[in-house]
């Protein structure tokens, strides 16, 4: 039995199918994890989502920002953006079944010493903090206030954690850490401007930022964390236990599988989506 973790697919079904065939994925004995962002910007969003739903007993995923955005658009909490191409899902006869399934997926997963999130874990949180706070958002997605949360989750404020936060502002910063974060200060203040492999100077006025996984005193130091979201890293980090798997498939770079038991990476080249 093997467990494979796939990076951000974003609707690129063909390279995903190619890698499944290349590793001889057997759903009767193998497992697939996903760092999220199953959909959006790629050509075959509905096919990716249907595959995951059909194999839901053998897959473990965490929600990414694009998955959350689909939920918001589908319930009318948000209008589609210019770059979205979610129509194949929104017009599908099985959309309600597929999107409801997404609502019950986690924002963080921990198993056998490995933590998986979409974007990262702020340096001021432990793994248990992460799981507990992810549950707060999961509870909102599955409850009566779901539409309110999906409306209020957009925005950059507050841009740093405070234990006293409550309500939708608390849920927003949790969501931003787990699904949007790249750079932050050592105390967890988010830099929403920098997206490349190097930070933009003074993106956070008067503060030094670094990739969330590079902070020497982060509370998850030494623990294995698998994440996606950050395509410009091309899977490279300065910490062997911070395993980045977004290798920019939808941007015309590559899709990556990571074999959990061996650390082996399997990649295939991708064509750039016309929706980028």
Region annotations inferred by a language model:
Residues 12-14, 40-42, 66-72, 109, ...:
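Active-site environment of divalent metal-dependent phosphoester hydrolases
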Residues 1-51, 68:
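N-terminal active-site segment of His-dependent metallophosphoesterases
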Residues 23-28, 55, 111, 219-220:
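Glycine-rich phosphate-binding loop signature in dinucleotide/nucleotide-binding domains
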Residues 131-276:
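Acidic, His/Gly-rich catalytic cores of divalent-metal-dependent hydrolytic chemistry
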Residues 46-49, 54-169:
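Active-site neighborhood of divalent metal-dependent phosphoester bond hydrolases
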Residues 2-10, 114-120, 244-245:
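Active-site-proximal beta-strand elements of phosphoester/diester hydrolases
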Residues 6-7, 33-36, 61-64, 225-228, ...:
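Active-site neighborhood of phospho(di)ester-bond hydrolases with catalytic His/Asp-centered motifs
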Residues 3, 30, 59, 114, ...:
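Short, conserved active-site loop motifs that form the nucleotide-linked donor/cofactor pocket
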